[in-house]
Amino acid sequence: MAGHSKFKNIQHRKGAQDKKRAKVFTKLIREIVTAAKTGSSNNPENNPRLRNALTAARSQNLPKERIDKAINSANDSSNNENYTEIRYEGYAPNGIAIIVEVLTDNKNRTAAEVRSSFTKYGGSLGETGSVNYLFNHCGVIQYPINIASNEDVLEAVIEAGGHDIISDDTTHTIYTDIENFSKVLAFLTGKYGIPEDSYIGWIPLNTIIIDDKEKAEKLLKLVEVLEESDDVQRVFGNYELSDDVYEIIQGEP
């Protein structure tokens, strides 16, 4: 999401990386288990969601033994661990729309945690559907900028069936329709290897520029707290930090 990559860069420098990595692995494993359980097959060739989950796991270097364990767990009939997919929507301060996607084994616990986080940082949790009209629901695939030229990647995206690409100084970001996401991801993975990131998400139609340091820090803290939950898979918002505010926050110890 707009502003989100900058936030992740800031946290990469500040955060306790082992702890963060463990949480990322937990989220990936939940998606693998859910995909394997809910799909028509445990074979990724016949289960697009599982195939996509495995690609995402490999992009984050989730060890193969943990991937295999997650799939075996999903196949175990005695395993009663099931996760429910829920989308929470609300507003952060200053009218910033936030979408929170979760996989949870306890809906009441997660709802209370998400609501508490919104309230604590000056936001308000709304009904499902209250802000999603401000976003485009689509597939997102990201490669480092040096994987190929913008023209070459664009040609590959068109051939694969994607519908847009935006390239900046560091990243090629490819957008796809949801129904084409798995096909485009498989095509690009075959051509360029495992992407840096790939997911179906909510991309803002327009962004609100945050040009005040205090407002930015409060917003980023809300996003950080939400993302710290093992239940939360991803957080999306329609904001972007101004260059000045981003540089100030990035420079803080």
Curated annotation (Swiss-Prot):
One of its GO terms (molecular function) is DNA binding. GO terms for biological process: regulation of DNA-templated transcription. It is found in: Cytoplasm. Its main location: cytoplasm. GO terms for cellular component: cytoplasm. It comes from the Bacteria. Residues 1-21 are annotated as: Disordered. Keywords: Cytoplasm, DNA-binding, Transcription, Transcription regulation. InterPro entries: Integrase-like_N, TACO1_YebC-like_2nd/3rd_dom, TACO1_YebC_N, Transcrip_reg_TACO1-like, Transcrip_reg_TACO1-like_dom3, YebC-like. Belongs to the TACO1 family. NCBIfam families: PRK00110.1, PRK12378.1, YebC/PmpR family DNA-binding transcriptional regulator. PANTHER family: PTHR12532:SF11, TRANSLATIONAL ACTIVATOR OF CYTOCHROME C OXIDASE 1. This is Probable transcriptional regulatory protein RAF_ORF0717. It comes from Rickettsia africae (strain ESF-5).
